[in-house]
């Protein structure tokens, strides 16, 4: 068991125990559902046990959260921002421990685990400033002695369903904004990263208690698909944010839309990186390496398709294969490791199935392509030479597999970038301004993230994060994403004594 190991003593410092109730409901930790073991992907050994919530406990949590919403929405936005600031400070105090937990339970390397928690802290900082800027527009009225303007008000409760690959960052993108906008939050974390869900919730709960606020402002559930389905169906939750596959996201959207709720979807990515003949090859190769190999290929923004101009194709490919052949794969908590395991045994099996499909469609494995025999879920980062019209290229294989293809012209490369159902992230490497502006313009990439001379992954929190097409169309984190977490009213006030009608209508 994880708690028996000296190197796992830090777990106690963030409120975890060998056995943990997985529901934070009206200020109490409770759960009476199935007991699961959460394991380390590095060796598949148990870290701790977690009891998932029952449907009765879900209902109790929603009732208390709904009651707490009345208090929270009445608090001025800057006061709500102060609470989020304190949450950020609480996370800062436990940054190293939480980052280590993310690495242990999810499998990403320690630097990325710490970076993920840091991203939540940055979101808290962003949200604090935002709490004083939830401004509506003043609109000129065509009628004399009339004033027209917009007012933004809280929705009430925001449901956040997160995925295993970013077990706390995606919560931060949503919850920090939702809270300052005056909403309570109901969080269902991924079933395979429950300890991250519990540890982060404990810190938030301490801040609420210290400020004498209702604990149910933030409600958390560890559970399976039935809890996610309940959130999607619940009319008390006006907005549901879901991160996961396009297949499941389509089902969530259908359920939420049928009850006229709002959906914020962050779904599959099948991200392309284009290297033009005028690109800085060294910069491109380093970027491709991080984009394709980082987090063992399990980021939504991982580079999965690489399009190389035919004149530099072999040069870039040789350099890239050289990097792949010397990458350190191993325990994500060990210094120097760049590639940890994929998250579960099922992920490893999907990798194997994916390689078989690739070979059946004429793909040539240039490096990697095998699982690594061990107690953990380790696979080899893989580069595949394949035809751009192979059907497997249109799909998202969630692992460190990179498809490499040639192109001749910019127009061809853009068409290839846009040829898949997904539309999350994209990047081009070039030194020509006219290429850059075509790429980011109306005839360029159709993705939500359109980069130049940087990887497809590693987005900053200041910009809105999200994609188009089968990626779902949602936007989280920065820019004006906050507007999705509030309801907008257009208000017109007549402060005169006459009743002029719009459009000059004379009615009697």
UniProtKB/Swiss-Prot annotation:
Keywords (A to Z) from UniProt: NAD, Oxidoreductase
CDD domains per the UniProt record, alphabetical: ALDH_F7_AASADH
Binding site for NAD(+): 244-249
Name used for this protein in its record: Aldehyde dehydrogenase family 7 member A1
Organism: Malus domestica
UniProt superkingdom: Eukaryota
Catalytic activities: an aldehyde + NAD(+) + H2O = a carboxylate + NADH + 2 H(+)
Family as reported in the entry's similarity comment: Belongs to the aldehyde dehydrogenase family.
Described function: May play a role in fruit development.
Induction: By osmotic pressure changes.
InterPro entries per record: Ald_DH/histidinol_DH, Ald_DH_C, Ald_DH_CS_GLU, Ald_DH_N, Aldehyde_DH_dom, ALDH7A1-like
Self-association and partners: Homotetramer.
The keyword Oxidoreductase is annotated on this UniProt entry: yes
Site residues (Transition state stabilizer), renumbered to this chain: 165
GO biological process per UniProt: aldehyde metabolic process
Enzyme Commission no: 1.2.1.3
Record bears the keyword tRNA processing: no
Catalytic site: 266, 300
């Amino acid at each position: 068991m994880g708690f028996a190991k000296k190197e796992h003593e830090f777990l106690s410092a963030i409120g975890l125990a060998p056995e943990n109730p997985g529901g934070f409901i009206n200020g109490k930790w409770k759960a009476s559902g199935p007991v699961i073991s959460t394991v380390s992907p590095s060796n598949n050994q148990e870290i701790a046990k977690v009891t998932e919530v029952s449907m009765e406990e879900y209902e109790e949590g929603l009732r208390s959260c709904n009651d707490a919403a009345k208090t929270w929405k009445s608090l001025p936005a800057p006061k709500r921002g102060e609470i989020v600031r304190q949450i950020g400070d609480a996370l800062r105090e436990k940054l190293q421990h939480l980052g280590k937990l993310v690495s242990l339970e999810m499998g990403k390397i320690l630097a990325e685990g710490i970076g993920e928690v840091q991203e939540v802290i940055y979101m808290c900082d962003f949200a604090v400033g935002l709490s004083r800027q939830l401004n509506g527009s003043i609109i000129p009225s065509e009628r004399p002695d009339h004033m027209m303007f917009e007012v933004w008000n809280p929705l009430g409760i925001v449901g956040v369903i997160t995925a295993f690959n970013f077990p706390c960052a995606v919560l931060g993108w949503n919850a920090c904004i939702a809270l300052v906008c005056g909403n309570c939050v109901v969080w269902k974390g991924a079933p395979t990263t429950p300890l991250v869900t519990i540890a982060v919730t404990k810190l938030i709960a301490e801040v609420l208690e210290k400020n004498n606020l209702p604990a149910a402002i933030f409600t958390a559930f560890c559970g399976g698909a039935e809890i996610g389905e309940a959130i999607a169906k619940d009319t008390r939750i006006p907005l549901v944010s879901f991160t996961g596959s396009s297949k499941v996201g389509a089902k969530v959207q259908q359920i939420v839309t049928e009850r006229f709720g709002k959906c914020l979807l962050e779904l599959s990515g099948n991200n392309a990186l284009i290297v033009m003949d005028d690109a800085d090859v060294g910069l491109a190769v380093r970027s491709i390496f991080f984009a394709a190999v980082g987090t063992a290929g399990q980021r939504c923004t991982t580079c999965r398709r690489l399009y190389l101009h035919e004149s530099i194709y072999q040069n870039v490919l040789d350099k890239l294969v050289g990097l792949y052949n010397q990458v350190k794969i191993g325990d994500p908590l060990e210094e120097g490791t760049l590639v940890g395991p994929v998250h579960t045994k099922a992920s490893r099996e999907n990798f194997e199935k994916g390689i078989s499909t690739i070979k059946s469609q004429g793909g040539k494995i240039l490096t990697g392509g095998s699982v690594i025999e061990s107690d953990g879920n380790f696979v080899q980062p893989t580069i595949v030479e394949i035809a751009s019209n192979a059907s497997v290229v249109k799909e998202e294989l969630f692992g460190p597999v990179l498809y490499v293809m040639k192109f001749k012209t910019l127009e061809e490369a853009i068409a290839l970038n846009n040829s898949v159902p997904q539309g999350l992230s994209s990047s081009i490497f070039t030194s020509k301004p006219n290429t850059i502006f075509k790429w980011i313009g109306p005839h360029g990439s159709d993705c939500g993230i359109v980069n130049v001379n940087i990887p497809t992954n590693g987005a900053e929190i200041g910009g809105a994060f999200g994609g188009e097409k089968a990626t779902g169309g949602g936007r989280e984190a920065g820019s004006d994403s906050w507007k999705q977490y509030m309801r907008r009213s257009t208000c017109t006030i007549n402060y005169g004594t006459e009743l002029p009608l719009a459009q000059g209508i004379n009615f009697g």
